[in-house]
């Protein structure tokens, strides 16, 4: 039986796993996607993060790679199971039975670090699947000297358009409104590098062999049509969270966020939570605060598991011997 099961392998869950290993807890992690990193991997892999302590800037990928390397000190005794979603959590005597996609796991404590749920991109409304219509970007080098169309008007759409313009001179941003939700400075920056078409919506696509070669755009006001050739279409209409199971699990929350106390305990004894999926007075959604919450949760769980031990928090310099 596990002492703690961590749900989620984003920056908060990975740090919780490292801390659990540091304290010799019998633990495991389940992650609903195929790789670690949560939202950072799903949405911002090649983007720079500027608010991580100690890093003036670092790409999301490099940061998560560093976290995985930090965790791997304990990976032989603390596995991460990918493509495993937490479907049900039930109390049984003095422990919990957690049902996942393919497993049944018994654990004394649960730490939820799922960031509020999985992120699903809002799709372009077309009937066919095309291989060059993308909702995530994993390698910017694939776009070198290609014709790129970016769809969207938010900060992420503008960020991608700006980043892509470093790899090709042919980037067109299409937005359905004249006004942008993105920062005006980003709009002005991209306007110097690429083409902006507003207010246009995608009417149809033309393609063959699973590849789009032409977008047919329709002007939102005049209904005039415009054909736009493209090698790749990058869609950034935003993301929606998958449905929360909090109610099914009996965990108190509001608007999909888990309510916790100062120890990071939820409304159910034995279940703790940390990261962007929680709420309490003064909560700030930052990677660093989520990791601090993970430290609090792991310390709370450790104290309950081993009450005979000191409550003093031991630092890594005392716990790791090279």
From Swiss-Prot:
InterPro entries: FAD/NAD-bd_sf, FAD/NAD-binding_dom, Fd--NADP_Rdtase_type_2, Ferredoxin-NADP_redctase_2. GO terms for molecular function: ferredoxin-NADP+ reductase activity; flavin adenine dinucleotide binding; NADP binding. It is an enzyme of class 1 (oxidoreductase). SUPFAM superfamilies: FAD/NAD(P)-binding domain (SSF51905). It comes from the Bacteria. This is Ferredoxin--NADP reductase. Its cofactor is FAD. It comes from Acholeplasma laidlawii (strain PG-8A). Binds 1 FAD per subunit. HAMAP family: FENR2 (MF_01685). It holds the Pfam family Pyr_redox_2. It catalyses: 2 reduced [2Fe-2S]-[ferredoxin] + NADP(+) + H(+) = 2 oxidized [2Fe-2S]-[ferredoxin] + NADPH. FAD binds at residues 12, 31, 39, 44, 86, 119, 317. The keyword Acetylation does not apply. Keywords: FAD, Flavoprotein, NADP, Oxidoreductase. Homodimer. Belongs to the ferredoxin--NADP reductase type 2 family. The keyword Zinc-finger does not apply. Its EC number is 1.18.1.2.
């Amino acid at each position: 039986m596990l002492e703690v099961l961590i749900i989620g392998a984003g920056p908060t869950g990975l740090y919780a796993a490292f801390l659990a290993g540091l304290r010799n807890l019998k633990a495991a992690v389940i992650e609903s996607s195929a790789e670690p990193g949560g939202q950072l991997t799903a949405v911002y892999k090649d983007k720079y993060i500027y608010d991580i302590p100690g890093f003036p800037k670092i790409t999301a990928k490099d940061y998560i790679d560093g976290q995985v390397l930090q965790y791997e000190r304990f990976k032989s005794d603390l596995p991460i199971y990918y493509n495993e979603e937490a479907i049900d959590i039930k109390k049984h005597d003095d422990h919990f039975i957690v049902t996942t996609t393919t497993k049944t796991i018994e654990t004394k404590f649960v730490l939820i670090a799922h960031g509020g749920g999985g992120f699903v991109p809002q799709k372009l409304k077309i009937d066919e699947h095309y291989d060059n219509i993308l909702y995530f970007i994993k390698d910017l080098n694939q776009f070198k000297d290609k014709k790129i169309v970016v769809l969207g008007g938010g900060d992420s759409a503008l960020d991608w358009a700006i980043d892509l313009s470093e790899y090709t001179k042919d980037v067109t941003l299409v937005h359905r409104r004249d006004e942008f939700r993105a920062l005006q400075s980003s709009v002005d920056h991209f306007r110097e590098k690429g083409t902006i078409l507003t207010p246009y919506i995608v009417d149809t696509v033309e393609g063959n062999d699973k590849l789009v070669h032409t977008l047919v755009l329709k002007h939102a006001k005049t209904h005039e049509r415009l054909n736009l050739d493209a090698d790749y279409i990058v869609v950034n209409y935003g993301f929606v969270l998958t449905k929360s199971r909090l109610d099914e699990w009996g965990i108190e929350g509001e608007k999909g966020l888990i309510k916790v106390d100062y120890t990071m305990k939820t409304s159910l004894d034995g279940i703790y939570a940390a990261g962007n999926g929680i709420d309490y007075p003064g909560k700030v959604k930052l990677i660093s605060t989520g990791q601090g919450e993970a430290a609090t949760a792991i310390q709370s769980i450790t104290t309950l598991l081993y009450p005979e031990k000191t409550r003093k928090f031991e630092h890594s310099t005392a716990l790791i011997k090279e």
